[in-house]
């Protein structure tokens, strides 16, 4: 990998572990629960986070194993499985897998010669479409070796309930260094102890958690109602407009888009195809600036342009496509 990457620390010693705060919650949030259970009802909507890295050469296998083991100490969520409460009464609970095995989650394969980058992408596609074993921590990684030019490919797949995109970047950062030599005395944490949590136990934890949160929720509700009432007396029109604005925002979130969307994507299957289009960040920034937009604007415009050409190739004309935009809620 290039040594100029500003997102990769010089070594693991330079990692600020206090910044790796995700994965601390014992219980899934409502959003994470939705992502976890959605694929059971609609498998076509599976959306794992898949990161594909192209390496100039294959890393030492034992060092890679050690790096992932170390990362599982720093981020305990890596060692955790999701336990559904009895009858799904509540949100799933994260529990340390008593049978956690790095060798199950991290594998390697050597492609038969001749092998180019497209052959490696086919392996990535297979990994991306395999459903997770929900009795284990929902992530997997694969080192693909044997490319004709000496390069290697490292692909990591994580379930969206584990973390968001920013958390995924943090996790990948933990596995990298700009120094080729091993890092001694890097900061470490004691791995969490294995647990044997059952669905009944998960339900019990949910009940206890809700009881503990109830007083604070009631207090917040009372304070909120008092503040709204006071504001309504002093500025009734402002309060009414804020309430209506909130209601409209909520309606936009929970109401499905009015448009039918793409006829080509409506009945899509479980298969996926991977391809690459290389564009340098400086070139993309220059194009965005020329059009009066941001880097993100240019990226989204390129995606929509690709969808437009895809539909044209199949003789379909679509004026608009509903899309979801992930937004980082981190502070």
PLM regions and their residue ranges:
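Soluble acyl-CoA-dependent acyltransferase catalytic core bearing the H(X)4D motif
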Residues: 2-33, 41, 48-331
């Amino acid at each position: 990998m290039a040594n100029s990457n500003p997102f990769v620390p010089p070594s693991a010693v330079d990692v600020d572990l206090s910044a790796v705060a995700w994965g601390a919650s014992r219980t899934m949030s409502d959003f994470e629960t939705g992502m976890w259970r959605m694929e059971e009802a609609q498998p076509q909507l599976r959306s794992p986070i898949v990161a594909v890295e192209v390496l100039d050469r294959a890393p030492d296998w034992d060092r890679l194993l050690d790096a992932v083991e170390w990362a599982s100490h720093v981020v305990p969520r890596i060692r955790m499985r999701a336990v559904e409460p009895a009858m799904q009464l509540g949100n799933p609970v994260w529990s340390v897998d008593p049978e956690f095995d790095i060798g199950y989650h991290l594998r390697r394969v050597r492609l038969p010669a001749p092998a180019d980058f497209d052959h490696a992408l086919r392996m990535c596609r297979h990994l991306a479409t395999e459903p997770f074993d929900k009795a284990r921590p929902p992530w997997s990684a694969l080192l693909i070796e044997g490319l004709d030019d000496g390069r290697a490919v490292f692909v990591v797949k994580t379930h969206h309930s584990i973390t968001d995109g920013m958390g995924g970047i943090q996790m990948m950062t933990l596995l990298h260094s700009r120094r080729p030599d091993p890092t001694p005395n890097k900061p470490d944490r004691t791995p969490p102890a294995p647990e044997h949590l059952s669905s009944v136990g998960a339900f019990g934890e949910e009940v206890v958690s809700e009881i503990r949160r109830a007083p604070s929720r009631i207090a917040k509700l009372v304070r909120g109602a008092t503040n709204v009432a006071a504001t309504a007396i002093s500025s009734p029109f402002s309060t009414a407009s804020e309430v209506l604005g909130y209601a409209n925002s909520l309606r936009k979130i929970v109401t499905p888009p009015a448009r039918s969307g793409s006829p080509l994507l409506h009945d899509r299957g479980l298969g996926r195809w991977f391809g690459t289009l290389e564009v340098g960040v400086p070139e993309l920034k220059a194009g965005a600036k020329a059009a009066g937009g941001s880097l993100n604007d240019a990226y989204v415009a390129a995606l929509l342009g690709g969808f437009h050409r895809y539909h044209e190739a199949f003789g379909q004309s679509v004026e608009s496509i509903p899309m979801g935009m992930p937004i980082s809620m981190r502070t």
